[in-house]
C-alpha cells in the first residue's frame, strides 16, 4: 500500500513538472530548491525554540508571535535580493543562453543580486577628514558573499585540475609512461588537499579565530577539548606577551591551570620553567606524550561515535536489516577513528615538535624554545593532523577535501574589504561558476560529489 502511495506521489510530481515549459524547468527547480534550503532550517529552528520554551516555561511567547515570525521567514525568502532569486537567476541565465558565456554573465548578475543587499554587519561609521573638519559617515564594506565565491573557486579548480590530470593520464598510459610517481600523486592528491586545508584551519583556530565562522570555532573547541588558558598562553607566546626567562607578569595564567591539574606551580612560570613541561599541555594525563596522544584518541573516538552512530542508524532505519545495521556501525567506527586520529595527531605533533624534534633542530636556548612554543610546535600539529583522512575510503577523502578547502581559503582573505574591490570577487565567482556549469553540461561526471549530482538534476532537461 505504501509503495502505491509513493508511486502516486511521484507520478503527481512528474505531471506537475511536465506542465512547466521545458526551458523554464531548471529555473523553477533552482528557485524551489533555494527557497527550501534558505527557509526550512530557520522554520525548524523556530519550531524547536517554540517547543522548548513551552516545555520549559521560559519567556513563554504567544502562539501568534511565533506564527508571525514563521510568516516573516517565508515572506523573506520570496524577496528579490535573497538566495532563491539568486539560484533562479544563475541557473536561468546559464540554461537560457549559450553555455560558458551565458553562465559567466548569469553568475555575475546573480552574485550582484546578493551583494546589493546592505547588511549592518558590513556597515561601519568611519571618521573622514573634510574641509569643514572631521565627519562621521557610514561606510559599506564588501565580503558578504566571500564564502560562496571561495566555494565556487574551489570547485572550478577541482574541475580544471581533475580534467588536466585525466588527459595527462590518458596520454601517458597510451605511451607506456604512467609511472609509480604518477600513481602516488593520484592517490595522495585528495588527502594532501584535506591535510593542507586542515593545517590552515587549525592554525587559524589557535592564532586568528576571528577568521573562522563562529560555529566552526565552537565545533573545533568541543572536539579538541582544550583548556582555554592554554590557548591564551600560546597566543601570548607568539605575540611576545610571554617570554622565556623574562618576568612579564604572565605566570598566574598557567599557574592557575597547574593548580587545577595537580602540577607544581613553577611549571606555569616562564622564568622558572624553560620550556613549559609537556605535562601542562597534557592537562592532567601524565608525562608521557605517546600516552597522552592515545588517551586523546580514545576520548575523541567515543565522543564522535556517540554522535555518528545514532545519525547513521536513523539513516539506515529506512531499510532496517542486519546488513544495514552492520554498515551503520562500521561507517560510524571508521569516521570516529578518523576524527580520533585527527585530534591525536594534532596533539602529538605539538609534543613531537616541542620535546623531540624541535630542540635537536633549533637548539635549547631561551630564544629557540621561544620560537618553538611561539608557533613552530603548533605548525607541527597542523602539518600532521589532516593525514588522518587516509583512514577514510577514497571517495570520502575527496568529499572531505572539497568540504574544508573553501573554509581554509577563507582564512587567507579578509572577511570585509572595500567596496571598490568587489569586482574582483565577482569576476572570480563568475569565471568559476561558468567553468563548473559548462562542465556539468559537457562532462557531468567531472563535477564530483553531491554538488555534481545536484547540478545535473537541476540543469538537466
Language model segments and positions:
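Glycine-rich, hydrophobic membrane-spanning regions of integral membrane proteins that mediate transport
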Residues: 1-461
